[in-house]
Amino acid sequence: MLHYAIVFFIISIIAGVFGFSGISAATAGIAKLFFIVFLVLAVLAILAGVAGLHAL
């Protein structure tokens, strides 16, 4: 489960870099949305891993 948290965290960082660096105005909104979604998924995966829930 911690593996998923790390993957989601890395994806959120990549999406944040693209969304907040001003690469393209058209993709910035999508990247910001992905940043929020994957950041939430990373937090949930970390909490599930800490709590010992392996059935997500």
Swiss-Prot record:
It is found in: Cell membrane. The keyword Zinc-finger does not apply. The chain crosses the membrane at residues 5-25, 33-53. One of its GO terms (cellular component) is plasma membrane. Pfam families: DUF1328. It is a multi-pass membrane protein. Keywords: Cell membrane, Membrane, Transmembrane, Transmembrane helix. InterPro entries: DUF1328. HAMAP family: UPF0391 (MF_01361). NCBIfam families: PRK13682.1-1. Belongs to the UPF0391 family. This is UPF0391 membrane protein GOX0352. It comes from Gluconobacter oxydans (strain 621H). The lineage of its organism: Bacteria, Pseudomonadati, Pseudomonadota, Alphaproteobacteria, Acetobacterales.
